[in-house]
Design a protein with these regions (language model features):
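Conserved short C-terminal alpha-helix that flanks the catalytic cleft of nucleotide-sugar-dependent
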Residues: 66, 165-166
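C-terminal cap of thioredoxin/glutaredoxin-like
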Residues: 164, 171, 179-187, 198-207, ...
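Post-cleavage N-terminal segment of exported redox proteins
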Residues: 2-59, 95-160, 186, 208-230, ...
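Short cysteine/histidine-rich metal-coordination sites, predominantly Zn2+-binding motifs
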Residues: 92-101, 193-202
Length: 261
């Protein structure tokens, strides 16, 4: 092969190579995984089959509460919102800024806000069966939809504060959320695999709890585990953390109610 032909051949290969590169997608592969992906097949089966998922007991109670008149106003959720299937997409947007509360709130807090202002009833306590049941029933309506935290200025500020908390070392063990759920994700701890901490399945039935619990309950449990003083339920710091976790998991599919070890 003479020199001129060699140059032409190499040039043709170079052009072909550049064309191939230009056709390849430039998107980075999404390495995020739901906690579901780290579970045993037996626990996964519990979550996937509604006839076996124990959280459905709470969801069924929540659907009943949806239609029950409550408080001095004798109003039900259905009186204002219609059928519960109209809640599709709602859970995927929380936490979000509430003009009534003048702060960022989670779904459970929104339920209690409606209960007080619309039903003229007493707010349900955190982790109460009625609150968790209704929250679970509403969350189910968003199954399969991507988490979609809204771009509200107040919410963005909350998630920034939450990111700071996520990276902050706390407790006698001097650990941060990031240390476990990013640096050590997929490693083993106490017989279980450390997940990436994406809140796609809350409210969740935890086998450890033998019941359904909120994301705030899980966050408080983590704080206790690293020997730190947990924030009280409803604290702005917990909501800020929830806001950051939702942003971190944006686009991942809602799978409520989850089942976890």
């Amino acid at each position: 092969m003479n020199l001129k032909l060699l140059r032409v051949t190499l040039a043709a290969y170079a052009v072909a190579f550049m064309l191939v590169l230009s056709c390849e997608p430039l998107q980075a592969q999404d390495s995020r995984k739901s906690g579901f992906d780290f579970m045993s097949s037996a626990t996964q089966t519990l979550q996937k089959d509604d006839s076996q998922n124990p959280a459905m007991l709470w969801a069924n109670d929540g659907r009943a509460v949806w239609s029950q008149p409550g408080g001095a106003a004798k109003k039900s959720c259905a009186n204002c919102h219609g059928d519960i299937n109209r809640m599709r997409g709602v859970a995927a947007r929380y936490p979000q800024y509430s003009t009534a509360a003048k702060r960022v709130i989670n779904l459970g807090q929104q339920i209690n806000q409606c209960r007080v202002s619309q039903q003229q009833a007493t707010a349900w306590p955190a982790e109460s069966a009625s609150l968790l049941g209704l929250e679970t029933a509403i969350a189910i309506e968003s199954r399969g939809l991507p988490l979609a935290p809204p771009s509200q200025p107040q919410r963005i500020e909350a998630q920034k504060r939450g990111e700071t908390l996520f990276n902050q070392r706390i407790g006698q063990m001097d650990l941060s959320c990031r240390d476990c759920h990013e640096s050590l994700a997929s490693k083993r701890l106490g017989g279980n695999t450390i997940p990436q901490a994406h809140p796609t399945g809350y409210p969740t039935y935890r086998l450890e709890w033998q019941g359904v619990g909120s994301l705030q309950r899980r966050l408080r449990g983590c704080m206790t585990a690293v020997r730190a003083e947990p924030y009280p339920y409803g604290a702005n710091e917990l909501v800020d953390l929830e806001a950051y976790l939702a942003k971190r998991a944006a686009g991942m599919k809602v799978e409520s109610p989850g089942v976890r070890p």
